């Protein structure tokens, strides 16, 4: 009897001694009745017809290959694969949520802001005609409206030639100026000379170099603005494309093996190894990671474009000061009115039925000396500062695609590599294989992940990124070029204050009008660019913690109290054996 007691105490002491060493303990054996598996699977698929009552050989399984009896059937395996792919898509969308929200909101803000600029520029131009040339007002309003409508369409991508827009504006204005200002007494019988006057406008350069100046300014500023909006819209397309990728069957099998095959053995609380997750994600997302190089170039090229968007490359500065340049062009016509009237009288004589008396008015009559006076305005938030703010936020996502595999693993339940974890086949103490890097240029030790080229949809989005990057580089202004004398002379001849932030131009009338150049009216936009409160942004940040709290740890170290109790029992048994 004493021998039996001594033997029992020795066994207890040995087991407790192993516990005192702090080694991780294996989980309890699987449920022999598949009860836990049935309960869990019912959450994914209502009904239990596919779940065996007791473990089965599982000879028909293709992914969760059993080493013994299993609680999974082929139908369950298929459901797990579908669920794994859906989980992957949701994780991708969660990863891109903040970035996607940032670009979508800014694209909407800037598009509407540019429309506001166009609307204000049209109003300023109409006000200039009303205050200085009331006789031209009805027709001028129509021509100005058509011009700025074309400007809006061009910004949105319409196939309109900027030079044609400007030429049409001046071609339409000159006949009105000639018949209403230079020859207001022109008989009705000779008013059919409009086509001749339109042609004479270009041949005689009646507006001097002002049309060419406006072409240069408007063309440069609108091209940059148009590319800027196109780039933002492409950014949205890139994110949408990667958000809804359809992963290969090989990837689906690997995800299933990592996340669900442990359930077939009744190991419901076991987590995949962190290193194993990294390898699987690197393989599944190898094609997506190929986007990284072009995505980085996209953000840097967009930054370079934004840095050059001022003065004649800033549509706010150009369009909001356009009324002053048009006013100067009309003054030029007035100054040369006598000579022009004589020349045009001869040029368009075939269109005139009889001689008429020239009623040219002196140049000072229509000149408002206040037109170029400057009213300085205090600094407020501008579109320029908004653009710079956007770039700074985008740069925080410059490694977005290369960091995606790590993000997915960090936001899904995985076990650290120094704990008991699931390696796709069984429980292991430590997963030693390192995750491969650099996309598809490396080989993996997982035969399921066949190295192929990027999916066609990924290849297409890469081609689009290459194209927009080339456009951005082409349109970007080399550093310092905007300050060159030639460009200053070309872009700031007519009424520019020349300040990078607050630009202003005086107007005629009872005093100076503050021009809201560098948009001081952003408050009109009902948008908020702060993405900190983006829907779901606060949720996915704590996703990992929530998942951890809902799962039990595997192989935890014994608590200090348990160790003390074990030591006490061990010592008691030792003294019993000795005595």
UniProtKB/Swiss-Prot annotation:
CC per GO annotation: Golgi lumen; lysosome; plasma membrane; side of membrane
Glycan attachment residues as annotated in the record: 123, 240, 417, 494, 508
Residues with a covalently attached lipid (GPI-anchor amidated serine): 553
This protein's UniProt keywords: Cell membrane, Disulfide bond, Glycoprotein, GPI-anchor, Heparan sulfate, Lipoprotein, Membrane, Phosphoprotein, Protease inhibitor, Proteoglycan, Pyrrolidone carboxylic acid, Signal
Tissue: In the developing limb, absent from the apical epidermal ridge at 11 dpc but highly expressed in the underlying mesenchyme. Expression in the mesenchyme at this stage is asymmetric with highest levels in the regions of the distal mesenchyme within the progress zone and within the proximal anterior and posterior limb bud. At later developmental stages including 12.5 and 13.5 dpc, expression is restricted to the interdigital webs and the regions of chondrocytic differentiation of the developing bones.
Record carries keyword Plastid: no
PROSITE patterns given in the database record: GLYPICAN
Post-translational modification: O-glycosylated; contains heparan sulfate and/or chondroitin sulfate.
Subcellular location: Cell membrane
Protein name stated in the entry: Glypican-3
Source lineage: Eukaryota, Metazoa, Chordata, Craniata, Vertebrata
């Amino acid at each position: 009897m004493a021998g039996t007691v001594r033997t029992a105490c020795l066994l207890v002491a040995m087991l407790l001694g192993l516990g005192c060493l702090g080694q991780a303990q294996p989980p309890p054996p699987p449920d022999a009745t598949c009860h836990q598996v049935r309960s869990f699977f019912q959450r994914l698929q209502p009904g239990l017809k596919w779940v065996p009552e007791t473990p089965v050989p599982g000879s028909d399984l293709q992914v969760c290959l059993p080493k013994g009896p299993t609680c999974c059937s082929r139908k369950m395996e298929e459901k797990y694969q579908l669920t794994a792919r859906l989980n992957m898509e949701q994780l991708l969308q969660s990863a891109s949520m903040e970035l996607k929200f940032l670009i979508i909101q800014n694209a909407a803000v800037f598009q509407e802001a540019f429309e506001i600029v166009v609307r204000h520029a049209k109003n300023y131009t109409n006000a200039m005609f009303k205050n200085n040339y009331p006789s031209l007002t009805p027709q001028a309003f129509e021509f100005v409206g058509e011009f700025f409508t074309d400007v809006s369409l061009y910004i949105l991508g319409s196939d309109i030639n900027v030079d044609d827009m400007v030429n049409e504006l001046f071609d339409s204005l000159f006949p009105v100026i000639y018949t209403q200002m230079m020859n207001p007494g022109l008989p009705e019988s000779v008013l059919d000379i409009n086509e001749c006057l339109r042609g004479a406008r270009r041949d005689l350069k009646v507006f001097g170099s002002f049309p060419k100046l406006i072409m240069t300014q408007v063309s440069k500023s609108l091209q940059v603005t148009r590319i800027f909006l196109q780039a933002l819209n492409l950014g949205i397309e890139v994110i949408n494309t990667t958000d809804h990728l359809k992963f290969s069957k090989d990837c689906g099998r690997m995800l299933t093996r990592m996340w669900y095959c442990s359930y077939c053995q009744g190991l419901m609380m076991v987590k995949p190894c962190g290193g194993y997750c990294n390898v699987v994600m690197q393989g599944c997302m190898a094609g997506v990671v190929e986007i990284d190089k072009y995505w980085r170039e996209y953000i840097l090229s967009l930054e370079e474009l934004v840095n050059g968007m001022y003065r004649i490359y800033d549509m706010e500065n150009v369009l909001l000061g356009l009324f002053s340049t048009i006013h100067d062009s009309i003054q030029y016509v007035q100054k040369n009115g006598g000579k022009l009237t004589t020349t045009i009288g001869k040029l368009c004589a075939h269109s005139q039925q009889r001689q008429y008396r020239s009623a040219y008015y002196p140049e000072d009559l229509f000149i408002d000396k206040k037109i170029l006076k400057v009213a300085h305005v205090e600094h407020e938030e501008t579109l320029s500062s908004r653009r710079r703010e956007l770039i700074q936020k985008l740069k925080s996502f410059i490694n977005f695609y290369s960091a995606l595999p790590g993000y997915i693993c960090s936001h899904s339940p995985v076990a650290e590599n120094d704990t008991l974890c699931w390696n796709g086949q069984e429980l292991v103490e430590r997963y030693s294989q390192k995750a491969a890097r650099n996309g598809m240029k490396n080989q993996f030790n997982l035969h399921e992940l066949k190295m192929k080229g990027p999916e066609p949809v990924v290849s297409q989005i890469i081609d689009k990124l290459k194209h927009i990057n080339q456009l951005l580089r082409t349109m970007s202004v080399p550093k310092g070029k905007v300050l060159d004398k030639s460009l200053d002379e070309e872009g700031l001849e007519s009424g520019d204050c020349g300040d990078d932030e607050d630009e202003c131009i005086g107007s005629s009338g009872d005093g100076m009008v503050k021009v809201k150049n560098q948009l001081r009216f952003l408050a009109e936009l009902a948008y908020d660019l702060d993405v900190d409160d983006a829907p779901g942004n606060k949720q996915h940040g704590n996703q990992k913690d929530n998942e951890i709290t809902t799962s039990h740890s595997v192989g935890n170290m014994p608590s200090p109290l348990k160790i003390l109790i074990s030591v006490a029992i061990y010592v008691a048994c030792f003294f019993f054996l000795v005595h």
